[in-house]
Amino acid sequence: MAKHPLWKDEYWLLLLQLYQKKPMGVKPLYSKGMVDLSLELHIAPEYLHEQMFKLRLVTPRIKRLWEHYGDNPKKLARQIHLLKDMEGYGNATAFYQGVEIKESFEHDWEPLEAEPSLTPVKLIIILDLYFQLTPITMVPETPEIIDLAKLIKTTPDTIVEAMNVYQICDPYLNRNDVVISKLIDACSKIWQRYGNGNPDKLYKLANDLKEYFK
């Protein structure tokens, strides 16, 4: 993977600190710590995840990093505090200047204006559950819907509303009735991205994304 234009060598400190959090080691791709750091730095989790794996390599740079901070978390925390106080830390303004759209991964984690309890990421997870249920079971009382609502911190009714929109998007159902919902735009975009793709890939992605909410 080519070097990200926003990556700085100082960010190794941030990855090392995250790596050392219990349980020590490479964190899941969409763990909360990994995603929050990616949003802070405006660098996709996939890139940071790959960089974190390099902390296990024996290279001169990584060796020095471990020698200086591996057994001294307080020293590491001080250096990170200084890093975050530096001008330009986490500032992507220069990189995004003249660019109207941020990287899609950032938008995927932002609350929907139409329904702040949802994000595109949550809609991806809901879409995966949609494919595991039948229309008659897409009701607030269904245990799987109740469990998912608790996990992603929304309501069963909101999940059912999203599933109703997905039913309209689903060509196999041939629904001709009109659904009035504030989620139509957001759900339609998620369906366009994943609704006609490989369900196994969607299932894996949804399971990976759930890691953030655990």
Regions found by a protein language model. Give the residues of each.
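Intrinsically disordered, charged low-complexity linkers and terminal tails
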Residues: 1-214
